[in-house]
């Protein structure tokens, strides 16, 4: 395989359509605006080209029932308690269920995962022993979570099998599962390195793939080694397939790289990129000395009302030490970081998700995509160095438009500079946390 980097990417047409959505304007505009006109233009183009992807449901569908999904999917959606699609689901699902390629940037917690899970399940006609759907993501925990979403929405589709593959586990077990027609999956969720290894060793046949999804695509494609892995996997799939890419952040530099994998994609950008802050999330900072962090953290955990909290630190050592300190101070906590064994990480993630513990101390391994609905408080014990990573971190609280609270400790000149960059990048004012505290109703759901 060539190592020429970007030049080695497959050249696909990037004659894309684009939908820019500003949430406030979309709310005012109701059922008019750029989304409708762009969709009409796409319908005309497809008609002229003899597109076989089917007719579209109106892009401003207001309920999941308007998407005309399979009865099995509709039942599962009702069981999950979902009634109305989020903004990103409303604008994407009507076309994605018919096989249109998608490039989607939307803030954390707006239901991007459900877009590709529902779209691929809607199109899936399972054939024993054939992989029809491939989903690639950058983190093992995220792969595990996506697999769980597939299980949740396919509960009334008993013939559909889903498997998750990631590094750190014996590849022989994956090979055994794939070889057996009784266990061979129709849907594969995987990290790039492990899936590439399965392809190279011919343990997996991707010649029947109809849907190719990359979640957190900016993170997957910005690292050259990971991008090369994806290219090798991509080449093992048919040329005629649907490709969908999703992320909360998509820089101008990464977009052309994404587009090379796509054919005439629908581009959805929910809210202007500079305003990717989370609706319903209260954001504050606390200025303090490094030595004051532990005392202030204990005070916050005592004073604030929360269901679950995630506390971000900058290193594995600090994660372990802070967790020990919290447990010794009668704050039962669990820690998750990248240096523990894979089985242990998954077990701890599951324990936290199942509400066995209310406090989790983590490095950035939990900073992207991980969706635990009870988290309504995120604390940056150590502030991140990157503005985009701040968004992913605080996005763990206030998922899918719910309320939440994010507090960042600022203890150095570097932290102050990062805070200024965050406010400039996302066009948001982050206030100093009031000494008297804040009203719980501003960050707690009724």
Swiss-Prot record:
The chain positions of domain Helicase ATP-binding read 93-268
**Where is the motif named DECD box mapped on this chain?**
215-218
Any Gene Ontology biological process: mRNA processing
Keywords, comma-separated and alphabetical: Acetylation, ATP-binding, Helicase, Hydrolase, mRNA processing, mRNA splicing, mRNA transport, Nucleotide-binding, Nucleus, Phosphoprotein, RNA-binding, Spliceosome, Transport
List of residues that carry Phosphothreonine: 169
Q: Which Pfam families match?
A: DEAD, Helicase_C
* Modified sites of kind N-acetylserine: 2
Top-level taxon: Eukaryota
**Catalysed reactions, semicolon-separated:** ATP + H2O = ADP + phosphate + H(+)
Broad class of enzyme this protein falls into: hydrolase
Signal peptide: which range, if any?
none
A GO MF annotation of the entry reads: ATP hydrolysis activity
Q: What is its main location?
A: nucleus
Which subcellular locations apply to this protein?
Nucleus
Q: From the UniProt entry, list the residue stretches annotated as the region Disordered.
A: 23-52
Where are the Phosphoserine modifications? 13, 37
Looking up InterPro entries in the UniProt record yields: DEAD/DEAH_box_helicase_dom, Helicase_ATP-bd, Helicase_C-like, P-loop_NTPase, RNA_helicase_DEAD_Q_motif
Protein family (similarity comment): Belongs to the DEAD box helicase family. DECD subfamily.
PANTHER family assigned: ATP-DEPENDENT RNA HELICASE DBP3
UniProt protein name: ATP-dependent RNA helicase SUB2
Q: Name its species.
A: Saccharomyces cerevisiae (strain YJM789) (Baker's yeast)
Q: Which gene encodes it?
A: SUB2
